[in-house]
Amino acid sequence: TISNAIQEIQRERGISYTQHLSSLNNKESLSIQRNSTDAALYKLLQLNQNDIETEKYLSTLRDSIDNKRISSEEILSQYIIIVSSLLEEISNINTIPFQGMEQLSTIEVKKIFFAKEKLGLLRTLISLKLHDKNALDGKKAEIKYLYYQYNTIIDEVIQSNNVEIADLLKKFTQLETSKKTFNFVEESIRSENLILDPSKWFSISTQTIDDLQATCAQALLISSDTLNNSATQAIRDSLFFLFFNIAISIIIAFFVITIVYSVYFPLEK
């Protein structure tokens, strides 16, 4: 449910940012997307009432966007804050009970979500570059840096000790749509004159993001299973140490009583 909410918020961010920077009329698309975002957040609220603050924050942000009281950079940064707060919930959910220790698998899952975040921003920026070259003056370095961040995160997860999650990500990188998307990202970094139908790029990159979203969901399930196993083991360990300490205490008490008794009540010869 959290991953779905993040997905919808990222989509809304892309449309909001595109509309703000270009002359495109995306009001209908934005309205439809906001409804989808609201539906995802509503489901999330059924599970966690703390997300009401996220809903309020988003409502204020939308009002600023609609009334043009916000810059394009602020649009991105404010949506990133919302996504980050939801990612933090993943940490809170996937923390071993009463130990407060975040699972290593959870850290890997969060990295995949962050990679997806970078990919979503790349889709938005390159879409704008295809629609309106002037809208992205000076953004080439940003595209290059986002792509570097994305690759760094993906490489870290693939080389991690969590074999199951690493294998999931390897399969994602080998998908044909994924290869096409990143070939074009590299082309956008090398060339100033991009020749591609904007709708085709949006379709390809969106499919890749959806594939990565599915990978995130599967990785989250793996992390949850790992958490359950770790929690069960933690409970067993705690019970073992509890009974062990009780046994030691009983043995010590027995020896103390024996010694005291022998001192004050020596055996008669």
Roles of regions detected by a PLM:
Residues 1-249, 253-265:
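Hydrophobic alpha-helical segments
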